[in-house]
Amino acid sequence: IEVLFSDKRPFFTENQSIFDDALVKNESVFYTRRIGGPRDDNGAAGDIEAAVKVIGSAGPVNYGLFAAREDDADEVGRSYYAGRFVIPRGKWLLGTQTTYTERPFRNRTALVNAFNYDIKPGEVWRLVGQFMRSDIDTDSGDSSGLGSFNAIQYLPNDRWQFEFSLLHYDDTLDVNDMGYLRRNDLAEWYLSAVHDWTDFPEDSRTASVSMRAFATRPSNTDGVRLMDNISVMLGQNMRSGSDISLRINASLAGYDDLISRGHGLVYLKNRFNGGLTYSTPKRGAWRKSVGVEVIQEGYEGWGMGLQAGLTWYPYEKLNLDFSLQPRQSRDWLIWIVDEERLGSYSRRNITGRVTANWFPAERHEVRLNAQWLTIDAEGRQGY
């Protein structure tokens, strides 16, 4: 599954909310990181030749129009277009969004149409959802796919939130030329409960406590039961500025239909993992964080990871962030492409990152990010 990254480029983040849609888990038919992403010919970062965004309203309709073109758009670079129209009212909202992508190097075009709604029938109830259709045109043939997401939310007060949702993406839905979908071929229900405690006495060292609980039951569109997931997260914010968080997760026995890359289903047993993180308040020019996690991978292997972070604020408009995450596990399960089988590895890896954020003036920002990963793995057995 593709990793989702947030966009820090001001042009693609400012006044972008008109293009927000109703999908779950950051999924969207308009994912700005696609623009200027890896080129289709060599994987290098694409250069943006021009981009324009127009936002406004006409009578009861709010609209957003977007177009971007990469260098060499006639041969290699891609062209992106999006149009969003929204009719907002006090108790309801209706919207449509269309995206179109041209990828000349692959002789591919992608058209995606979406319709979303947001209805508040009462003070504590909310209905949100979205319907999508994708139409892909390539040299090898055309395809179209359908998808939907529908949720009901219950918000009895400012401390409790509940949500139940259903999604269905067929196996030919494809919005990833300009959007982001973690996967297609999925039918899933999702249940969540959120509770916040904020009414602590003024002399309490605790400012707030939050609890998040989630459960999902997924299957693919052939009816194959995938791994159910149950997660609980607890967070505590202190008046001093420190915070602590606890995460516990259980993935219940089921099939993985992606790990073998089209070579059949893989049945996995129950897996459990959890983590604890603590961040200190800012003292002088420094803030620190530490964390530990316990993970279960593969068929029966356990592992452990550590996290250490340090943030330096040399002055108000500049901060430097350093982090290091070593991890060790003994049953890292991956698909070996050349041998067309699963392999279990004992691995040790370290992830490091250095980030600099500088805000020289209002509406100006400079961000630099360097990240590296080292892996040392030893084969244990094949399947």
Residue ranges: model-predicted function:
Residues 1-217, 248-256, 281, 292-295:
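Outer-membrane beta-barrel channel domains
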